[in-house]
Amino acid sequence: MSERKAINKYYPPDYNPLEAEKLSRKMAKKLKTMNKSHASIRLMTPFSMRCLECNEYIPKSRKFNGKKELLKEKYLDSIKIYRLTISCPRCANSIAFRTDPGNSDYVMEVGGVRNYVPQKPNDDLNAKTAVESIDETLQRLVREKEMEQNEKMGIKEQADDKMDLLEKRLAKIQQEQEDDEELENLRKKNLEMSQRAEMINRSKHAQQEKAVTTDDLDNLVDQVFDNHRQRTNKPGNNNDEKRTPLFNPTSTKGKIQKKSSVRTNPLGIVIKRGKSLK
């Protein structure tokens, strides 16, 4: 019987362990990259879809174990296009969709229907089918090349006139600074003018208020005197004329006399001073 674990192994005379390691690594790389076009991956659905067999709703961003397949077609002969296939979680129907690098989107192929298809208002039939025609690609490439050439020419001209550009920028900055200073001066002047106008208006209002108060006082005094005159000059009010003053200096003028020294008695006998009755 042979040994289960062989201890003695045959090594040929031309055996080199370094070369054997290199060969094993190369074979491992070949085995890994042998079926690179077909690979099983873990993916998430990029949009919501519906299965055509069982009408199962598959939401967006749901995880699946699917397969990735590299197609022979290429967008603009440089960008690769991949086909992704998943199975329906209810009926195991295969659903396939592929990448669309022209519109930065995905296109449904087999087994399902996309629930919502975003469409632009000015899209053509080719754009709706997410396939760009050869003429359109050529026109777009020509436009892109023209734009690149124009940009390069503009950059060259700018490189030739760098000093002029710097001078223009400096002049522009200086002009902006001068404009800012002028604006600040105008703002200060406007503030001063507005403050002066406010002071003048306040003084005018104060003078007007003073004049109004003096006029009101004069009017009140005149009104009081007028009312008093009207009361005194009424026709039925003659009491002042009938009244006589208590003291009339004109009536007693020249009539004041001294008291006589002669005394009288009720019997009619005159009695003089210094004499007595016998």
Swiss-Prot record:
Motif extent (Nuclear localization signal) = 242-258, 260-278
Q: Name one GO cellular component term.
A: nucleus
Q: Where in the cell is it found?
A: Nucleus
| Keywords annotated in UniProt | Metal-binding, mRNA processing, mRNA splicing, Nucleus, Spliceosome, Zinc
- Induction per the UniProt record: Expressed in exponential-phase cells grown in rich medium.
Q: Name one GO biological process term.
A: generation of catalytic spliceosome for first transesterification step
Q: Name one Pfam family in it.
A: Saf4_Yju2
In residue numbers, the region (Disordered) covers: 228-278
The UniProt entry, under InterPro entries, shows:
Saf4/Yju2, Yju2
Q: Does the keyword Nucleus apply?
A: yes
Q: Which residues are noted in the entry as Zn(2+)-binding? A: 51, 54, 88, 91
Gene Ontology molecular function, alphabetical: metal ion binding; U2 snRNA binding
User: Its quaternary structure?
Assistant: Component of the spliceosome. Present in the activated B complex, the catalytically activated B* complex which catalyzes the branching, the catalytic step 1 C complex catalyzing the exon ligation, and the postcatalytic P complex containing the ligated exons (mRNA) and the excised lariat intron. Interacts (via C-terminus) with CLF1. Interacts (via N-terminus) with SYF1. Interacts with U2 snRNA; this interaction is direct.
Q: What does this protein do?
A: Part of the spliceosome which catalyzes two sequential transesterification reactions, first the excision of the non-coding intron from pre-mRNA and then the ligation of the coding exons to form the mature mRNA. Plays a role (via N-terminus) in stabilizing the structure of the spliceosome catalytic core and docking of the branch helix into the active site, producing 5'-exon and lariat intron-3'-intermediates. Further stabilizes spliceosome conformation for 3'-splice site docking (via C-terminus) promoting exon ligation.
Q: What else is known?
A: Present with 2250 molecules/cell in log phase SD medium.
Give the family this protein belongs to, as stated in its UniProt record.
Answer: Belongs to the CWC16 family. YJU2 subfamily.
Q: What is this protein called?
A: Splicing factor YJU2
The encoding gene: YJU2
